[in-house]
């Protein structure tokens, strides 16, 4: 399931965050944090994990997502890996790969299972060429290039890549979510069911039908969730 999450940050918030990141001296070679599979195909820059600016900006992003009902519905978050930040420019790219299954949070000993991958775009799409995120799913390859402040949520099991940036610079945040429901098919069913309930609420639909659907939703969540 691939879901676009609009307006995680306003355009002004995204621009201010990008400016602070661009001015930072904490950028390092992105291969420093890549795994065995990713390192040979990863060519980008990244804000060092655990740096003060990464922690500050990451906290802002997580706080905004916690208030975003579409993100909650799609990801059903249990744990969120502290957001990271990357930059692509001058032909930089990231070849096709699958994210590692488990991420160790630096300095904490905590582990996060990467059920859901998230990319939050911070650069307006007209300011750079290339840089599309390509995600392979059951319906083929999905090409993603969103407005600044919008995010894309997709299964951590997906093959994905970032095309070379040939003009300008693409700055984004990326991170992972350990979901209450680890299986993507089950999450997709719950997402569709929640959407149907919300539409019934908005249209003042049949109350008995709404109660039945709400009951089904929570019983399925109870059956499938890990806390």
Curated annotation (Swiss-Prot):
Signal sequence bounds: none
Note accompanying the cofactor annotation: Binds 1 Fe(2+) ion per subunit.
Domain Fe2OG dioxygenase: 79-179
Residue numbers binding Fe cation: 97, 99, 160
Entry-linked SUPFAM superfamilies: Clavaminate synthase-like (SSF51197)
Domain of life assignment: Bacteria
Enzyme Commission number(s): 1.14.11.-
Source species of the chain: Paraburkholderia phymatum (strain DSM 17167 / CIP 108236 / LMG 21445 / STM815) (Burkholderia phymatum)
GO molecular function: 2-oxoglutarate-dependent dioxygenase activity; iron ion binding; L-ascorbic acid binding
Protein name as catalogued: PKHD-type hydroxylase Bphy_5374
UniProt xrefs under InterPro entries: Oxoglu/Fe-dep_dioxygenase_dom, PKHD_C, PKHD_hydroxylase, Pro_4_hyd_alph, Pro_4_hyd_alph_FE2OG_OXY
BP GO annotations: DNA damage response; intracellular iron ion homeostasis
Pfam families: 2OG-FeII_Oxy_3, PKHD_C
Chain residues that bind 2-oxoglutarate: 170
PANTHER family: PKHD-TYPE HYDROXYLASE YBIX (PTHR41536:SF1)
């Amino acid at each position: 399931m691939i879901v676009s999450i609009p307006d995680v940050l306003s355009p002004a918030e995204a621009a201010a965050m990008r400016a602070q990141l661009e001015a930072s001296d904490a950028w390092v070679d992105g291969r420093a944090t890549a795994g065995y599979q990713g390192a040979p195909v990863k060519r980008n820059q990244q804000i060092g994990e655990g740096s003060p600016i990464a922690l500050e900006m990451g906290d802002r992003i997580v706080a905004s997502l916690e208030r975003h009902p579409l993100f909650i519905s799609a990801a059903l978050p249990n744990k969120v890996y502290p957001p990271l930040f990357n930059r692509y420019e001058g032909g930089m790219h990231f070849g096709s790969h699958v994210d590692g299954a488990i991420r160790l949070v630096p300095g904490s000993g905590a582990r996060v299972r990467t059920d859901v991958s998230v990319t939050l775009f911070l650069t307006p799409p007209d300011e750079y060429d290339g840089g599309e995120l390509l995600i392979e799913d059951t319906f083929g390859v999905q090409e993603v290039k969103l407005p600044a402040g919008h995010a894309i949520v997709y299964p951590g099991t997906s093959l994905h890549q970032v095309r070379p940036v040939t003009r300008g610079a693409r700055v984004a945040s990326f991170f992972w979510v350990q979901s209450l429901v680890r299986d993507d098919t089950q999450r997709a069913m719950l997402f569709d069911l929640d959407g149907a309930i919300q539409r019934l609420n908005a249209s003042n639909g049949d109350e008995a039908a709404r109660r039945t659907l709400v009951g089904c939703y929570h019983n399925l969540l109870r059956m499938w969730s890990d806390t």
